[in-house]
Amino acid sequence: MIQLNNGNKKILQIAIPSIVSNITVPLLGLIDVTIVGHLGSAAYIGAIAVGGMLFNIIYWIFGFLRMGTSGMTSQAYGRHDLNEVTRLLLRSVGVGLFIAFTLLALQYPIERIAFTFIQTTEEVEHLAGLYFRICIWGAPAVLGLYSFAGWYIGMQNSRFPMYIAITQNIVNIAVSLLLVYGLGMKIEGVAIGTLTAQYAGLVMAYLLWLRYYSTLRKRIEWHSFFDKQAMYRFFQVNRDIFFRTICLVAVTVFFTSAGAAQGEVVLAVNTLLMQLFTLFSYIMDGFAYAGEALAGRYIGANNQKALHKTVRQLFGWGLGLSLSFTLLYSIGGQSFLGLLTDETTVIHASESYFYWVLAIPLAGFSAFLFDGIFIGATATHLMLKAMIVASVSFFLIYYGFRGTMGNHALWMAFITYLLLRGVMQGVMGRNILGYKTSKKD
C-alpha cells in the first residue's frame, strides 16, 4: 500500500475532488446533446453546439470570479482572518450578481452581435436563439457558483464544489428528460433543464455554507463591504485574471478558426487531437486548484518552508503525470481517436500531427501548476505578463511559419505557447516563493 506524507495528502484531498468536478463540467453539455440528438433533426444538435459555445465564451471570460476569490480567500484562511474570509465571499458574490444582471440587461444585443459572427442555417439560428434566451437567465446562478466554488477551494474544501457539480448533472438529466420526453418541450425543455440545474447548484452551495460555515454569519460587516483599499485589491487581482483569460480565449478560438480555414479534414483532426489536450488539462487543473489553495494558505501564514515543500510536491505530481500521459498517448492515443470517429481519412491525417500531442504533457504541465501557485499568491500581474508574451509568441510563430509548415505551424505555436507560460512563470516564481503576505506582486 502506498504511504503518502501529510503534504501529498493535502494536495490529493483538494486535487481529486477538483478533477471529478472538472470532468462533470462537459457532461452538462453532453447530456443536452444526447437528449436532443434523438429529436429527429440535426438542427437541434447544431443549436445546442452554437448555444453552448456562446455560453462557454461568456462564462469563461468571467472565470476570474472563481480564481480571484480562491487566491485571496486562501491567504485570509492562512492568516486565520475569518472576518476577511467572510467579506471576500460577500464581495465576490456581489460582483458576480452585478455582472450577471448586466448580462441579462444586455442579452438582446449580445445575441444579435453573436449571430452576426456565427454563420449557420436559419433553423439552427432560430433554435439556438431559443436556447440562449432561456439559459441566459442562469447567469446569476452560474456566476454566483463561481464565487462559492472559489471561496470553498480557498477554504481548502474542494469536496463541496464536487458535490454541487454532481448534483447539477443529476438534476439536469431528470428535468430535461421529463420536459423533453414527458411534456414534449424539445429544445426549450433542454434549456429549462440546464437552467434548473444551475439554480439547484447555487441553492445547494448556499445551503452547504449555512450548514457548515454558519458561525461566519456573525462576522458579516456590511459597512466594510465597500472598503476602498480592499475593493481596489479585489478588482486589481480580478482585472489581471480577466485580461489573462481574454488572451487564453483568443488563442483557443483562433486555434479552431485557423484549423477551419485549412479545410474540414484539418479542422476535424485538430478537434480530435485537442480532446487529448483537454483530457490532460482536466487532470492538471485539479492539481492547479490544489496549488491555489495551499500556496495561498502558506503565503497567508508566512510559512515559506511549507510553501516550498508544497511546490516541490506539486511539481513531483505534475512531472509524474505528464510522463504517464506521454506514455499513455504514445501507446493508446491512436486507438482513443478511433473511439471518437470512424472516418479513416481523419484518422490517417492525424498520424502526421500526433507527435505534437505527445509533446503537450511535458511542455504544458508547469504552466498549469504555476497558474495555480500564482493565483494562490495573488501574483496575477506577473501571470498576465507571462500570458501576454506567450500569446504574442503564439501568433508570431504561426504567421511566421504557416506558409512553409501549414497546420504544423499551428501546433508548433501552441506547444511553444504552453512552454513559454511555464518557463516565464518559473523564472518569476522565484520571487513569489520568497513572498511575505505584505509584499505586492
What are these regions (language model features)?
Residues I45-A105, V142-F160, V269-I331, F365-T378, ...:
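Small-residue-rich hydrophobic transmembrane alpha-helices
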Residues M1-A15, T73-P140, G182-F242, A295-I360, ...:
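Short alpha-helical transmembrane segments in multi-pass integral membrane proteins
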Residues Q13-D32, I134, L145, T167-Q168, ...:
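Transmembrane helical elements of multi-pass membrane transporters/channels
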Residues L27-G46, F115-E122, L178-M185, I246-L279, ...:
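Helix-terminus/linker motif at the lipid-water interface of multi-pass membrane proteins
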Residues H38-S41, Q75, G154, L183, ...:
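Membrane-helix boundary and inter-helical linker elements of multi-pass secondary transporters
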Residues L30-T34, S147-W151, I173-L178, Y206, ...:
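Alpha-helical transmembrane segments of multipass membrane proteins
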Residues I134-I153, P161-N169, V190-A205, D285-A288, ...:
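Short runs within selected transmembrane alpha-helices of multi-pass transporters and secretion channels
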